[in-house]
Amino acid sequence: MTWTLRNLHNSQKKVLVDITIWLALSPYGDMALFTSFENIIGEYYRYSILPLHQNLHKLLFTLFLICLASWKEGNRSCRYKWQKFVCNKLNSPETNFVPIRTSVNKNSKMIVEKQISIHISLKCIVYKEY
């Protein structure tokens, strides 16, 4: 479980930030999944990256649940759901969510060892505090 922060553009009052989050999820560890996701979101506050969006925490967690539910149901339209949700809920010039990419480890023979990798790429503009 890792996350990286990279400044793409600097100006006097704005910083364009690219945040990438990787989560390794197990179908038998729902509570652990939520805890891990909350911990990563907590890092945003700790490093004063917010406010990226007023409801960023709630939005990301909701999107995460949508993805997890789609994967468990074997739904292949998860990417489309993300695109539709983002267009409806977060249509602002300041923030742009890139749809996630999901993959399942098909080489594992045991169900408990199967994992899904969720890649969330978030590009947004944050304002510097002077």
Swiss-Prot record:
It comes from the Eukaryota. This is Uncharacterized protein YER135C.
